[in-house]
Amino acid sequence: MNIITTTTTDTTTALLRLMAWLSPVFPVGSFSYSHGLERAVHDGYVADTATMSDWLRWLVTRGSGWNDAVLCAESWRRAVAKGDLVEVAELAEALAGSRERHMETMLQGEAFLAAARSWPSSVFDRLPADCPYPVAVGAVAGANKVSLGLTLAAFLQAFCINLLQASIRLSVMGQNGVTATMSDLEPVLAETATRIEKTSLSDLGSATYISDIMAMKHETQHSRLFRT
């Protein structure tokens, strides 16, 4: 009997690499960052499953999650086309709106590149030593021939999963709430990833001011679980 499958060996390998790079156990220290969520919980903006779902939805479609994914896509394209990755890295760093957001993206980017060198590629020579996280992910994925669509969908999901893990530690919700939220956000993530495939740097923009302010206020928060 012949078994027909639509997954090729190359696609499977690419998917395995992507899952490894964006896994919570990949050594980038993502567990120590809440992206301002800790302050949002402290100030009452996020208090339960519904408000957490809304918070993520806005970040992914109108906020920092959107911008990071646009930067990831641009880096992917430049890695494939042998374009200027330093330029997009400098832009991504400049877009970090506060000290802790800057720390979060730069330290994770540095750690990602160090760990991803287990998959040798010439793209590392084209990236700056100080590289924002979404630029690092996009460039490495592009250089390893992982499809842009898969890269963006996985990147957005990893962004949400990290904050959902933080929400458990902050006692916003339990594991059932997390799985319900991921199911609820699935079409949003898929649609947003598809939209971002067609974007350029001119599509960068954010309207999630409260999230940005929470990231700034967290800098002076005395009692904390997270670095950001």
From Swiss-Prot:
It is found in: Cytoplasm. GO terms for cellular component: cytoplasm. GO terms for molecular function: nickel cation binding. It comes from the Bacteria. Keywords: Chaperone, Cytoplasm, Nickel insertion. The keyword Chaperone applies. InterPro entries: UreF, UreF_sf. The keyword Cytoplasm applies. Belongs to the UreF family. Required for maturation of urease via the functional incorporation of the urease nickel metallocenter. UreD, UreF and UreG form a complex that acts as a GTP-hydrolysis-dependent molecular chaperone, activating the urease apoprotein by helping to assemble the nickel containing metallocenter of UreC. The UreE protein probably delivers the nickel. This is Urease accessory protein UreF 1. It comes from Brucella anthropi (strain ATCC 49188 / DSM 6882 / CCUG 24695 / JCM 21032 / LMG 3331 / NBRC 15819 / NCTC 12168 / Alc 37).
